[in-house]
Amino acid sequence: MTAMTTEILLTNDDGIDAVGLRALADALSRDYDVTVVAPESNQSGVGGARSWWDTTVEYTETGAGYAVDGTPADCVAVADVALGLDPDAVVSGCNHGPNIGAHILGQSGTVGAAMEASFLGTPAIAVSLYDRGNLPVPPTLDNGDFAVAGEVVVDLLGRAERAAADGDLALPFGADVLNVNVPAADDETAADPTYRLTEPARGFDVIEFRPGEEGPEDENVPEGWEFNERRGEMGMELRDRFWREFLRGDVPDDPGSDRLAVVEGEVSISPLSSSRSIAGDRAGEVVNGPAEAASGASRIEQD
């Protein structure tokens, strides 16, 4: 009896023509039955947004796969409902730049698609590329740059297959989603990369821009990441100072953070839960109400 081939749904947020998607499709197709359902245009930064109500999500079958006029999360829904696919796992990527830091996970379309899959009960891997010589995003990329990313995803899927229970793939570390950041193939660490279990870093802040106000020093900051280019505008932006610090050789970060793993040229693997809850075994307990709290006789106990 021939074993069933594991079915993979492949999507991304950079669009169906993105080189990272094509590179992963090539790598995964050697071992898996791969169906590509991806946005017809770049959807970077939309997070887990979905098209709702009176919005019609159009999709077209192309030589590269199904092109969806919608978000990455829409692509997962189209695959599930409109196309009737029942993949064993969803892979989202490979993104053309890293997706690291807790605040970025909420903004990333790559991670958003993976989360959408987990809401529908399918394990998912979000994978992104980083090039330490061209942060945050390399100016040009080709298939070869994603070679290590393909190898890492195939390895993680293989582990999930070996841990399968009742035919369902089981991601490592008990995760619903793995957020994975992988070095480019020409990185000196890429020949034998270290896998590092990480948590999304939490260091970021809000920058306020005021017309005519002097911005922070922008020495050694790549084009497009300066603060001074925003002079003359009024507004706010959630901006991660990490890249500026990294480019200056100053990286204050906690051991175990996804950002520090990137600095060290490692494969960062952050296990994520789709529930986003930390109640754990205490879920369902009764918490004393306001009357008890007002009397000073009550508080939410911690173990």
Report residues per predicted region.
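Terminal disorder- and signal-encoded targeting elements
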Residues: M1-E7, R30, D303
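Internal, conserved structured core segments that host functional sites
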Residues: D88-V137, D145-F146, G150
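A cross-family phosphate/adenosyl-ligand binding-site feature
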Residues: A18-D86
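Short, glycine-rich nucleotide/cofactor-binding loops
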Residues: L10-D17, I104-G106
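A structural-propensity feature for long, helix-poor, extended segments
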Residues: D142-E161
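C-terminal accessory domains and tails appended to enzymatic cores
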Residues: D166-D303
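Short glycine-rich anion-binding loops that position phosphate/pyrophosphate groups of nucleotides
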Residues: N42, T71-P72, N95-P98, A185, ...
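Hydrophobic/aromatic beta-strand patches that form the interior of the parallel beta-sheet core
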Residues: T35-V37, Y66, V91, P123-V127, ...
